[in-house]
From Swiss-Prot:
It holds the Pfam family Ribosomal_L14. Part of the 50S ribosomal subunit. Forms a cluster with proteins L3 and L24e, part of which may contact the 16S rRNA in 2 intersubunit bridges. The keyword Ribosomal protein applies. Signal peptide: none annotated. Binds to 23S rRNA. Forms part of two intersubunit bridges in the 70S ribosome. Belongs to the universal ribosomal protein uL14 family. GO terms for biological process: translation. This is Large ribosomal subunit protein uL14. NCBIfam families: PRK08571.1, uL14_arch.
Length: 132
């Protein structure tokens, strides 16, 4: 796992619903924890593009539902600033389900993947068709 080069806005707190952008059988995910989050008192843990989060599968196949799994956020609606000054935002909030080491469980990723997530997680970038 590599460090992030951009200033990522942590806009997805606990309870946020994400679209599952892979073919594992999950359709909708809910963030329940953010890995390595260190916050202040009374602040909800939040993640952004490129962060690993733990999610609960809310909609999907009966085998996938109600499971708690690690996932990587690949898109977010809230714009964030890159090191070169450009601002990036996507149409939806999306994540892919991964193993604890960071390799994707699915065999394809639907839609674009942010450049920050692709650089940080090589397994995700291998499956990405569009890196934006």
């Amino acid at each position: 796992m590599k460090g992030l080069g951009s200033t990522i806005v942590r806009s997805l707190p606990n309870g946020a619903r994400l679209v599952c952008a892979d073919n594992t059988g999950a359709k909708e995910l809910e963030v329940i924890a953010v890995k390595n989050y260190v916050g202040t008192v009374r602040r909800l843990p939040a993640g952004g593009v490129g962060h690993m989060v733990f999610v609960s599968v809310k909609k999907g196949t009966p085998e996938m539902r109600k499971q708690v799994l690690p996932a990587i956020i690949i898109r977010q609606k809230k714009e964030y600033k890159r090191a070169d000054g450009t601002r990036v935002k996507f149409e939806d909030n999306a994540a892919v389900i991964v193993t604890p080491e960071g390799t994707p469980k699915g065999s394809e990723i639907k839609g674009p993947v942010s450049k920050e997530a692709a650089e940080r997680w090589p397994g995700v970038s291998r499956l990405a068709k569009i890196i934006h």
